[in-house]
Amino acid sequence: MHTLVDPFGRKIEYLRLSVTDRCDLRCFYCMPEGFSDFEEPAHWLTFDEIERLVGVMTEMGLQRVRITGGEPLVRKDVDQLAYRLKNNAGIKDLSLSTNATRLAKQAQKLRAAGVDRLNISLDTLKPERFKDITQGRLDKVLDGILTAKAEGFDPIKLNMVAMKGVNDDEISDMLDFCVEHGLTLRMIETMPMGDTGRNATDHYLDLQNVKKQLTERFNLIPTIDGTIDGGLIHGGGPARYLRVAGTNTHVGFITPISQHFCETCNRVRLSVDGTLYMCLGQEHHYPLRDLLRRGIPDDELKEALVAAIGLKPERHEFNEKPTQVIRFMSMTGG
């Protein structure tokens, strides 16, 4: 029987699915300014190819899919793909990561298609700072967040990349914003991903210290096993959570540098061109697009997936080899 289990006994149950490498923002830690070397649409996996691959993977143990980019909402009819994936009985959880610039117009369709949860990137609440980080408009993002909340998405997680000298002075403000609107905040350490022209590691901020400061300011309460509801957190990712006393707001800390979580990694990433990446912090990959376009039988596709998962490393090497990963975050799929 073909199963998605890596050489270290970890069950791969989670696919991060990039539907485009394009984005309508230019966050400096994700994509170089002026970058235009995107994959040609002819190289993108079609929705039919994606649906077939996900279907085969669910037979091997896949249970969760997150649609990512680039910015996934720049791809036409992504809600239709979501609907098709959600109707696969093997998929227990379907989520989407977005910068929310187009979310106000698409939230209703995504909700109707069956998307369960949203993760939204938001590094600052200051319009000018937002423009400096992303070259975009903050008001469109805030509109998208509030529209999604009104449509009933729950939970909505805000992903804030914490950066020294960039936005570390408004972490408390961001948590206040989440308390006000009933959102979950996830703090993320910067990672060395490709040469974007501005070294993200120069802005590295150890979140262990941030956690101490927020705990004192907000009276953060530990949750069972560092999760929400004792392990029943929607998504079950790498974040370790604390709860703001007297509220239902949680704040999570994703710490790939200061306290990595590789031993429990249960995910792989599929880029828009059909390349399966085993680790965000390593270059191990396996091309699947040509196999899909040759129309190989499911058994052969399963054998290829077993071979691919066999390449998954034990852990990343961000600390030991910070320049090892040459691809940009936007190419991998968030």
Identify the function of each model-found stretch.
Residues 44-67, 74-188:
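Radical SAM/AdoMet-radical enzyme domain recognition
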Residues 7-47:
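Canonical Radical SAM [4Fe-4S] cluster-binding loop centered on the CxxxCxxC motif
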Residues 20-22, 60, 113, 245, ...:
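A short, compositionally biased micro-patch
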Residues 35-40, 126-133, 194-198, 287-288:
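A short acidic, helix-capping loop that chelates divalent metal ions and anchors anionic groups
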Residues 24, 123-124, 282:
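Short connector loops/turns at beta-strand edges and beta->alpha or beta->beta junctions
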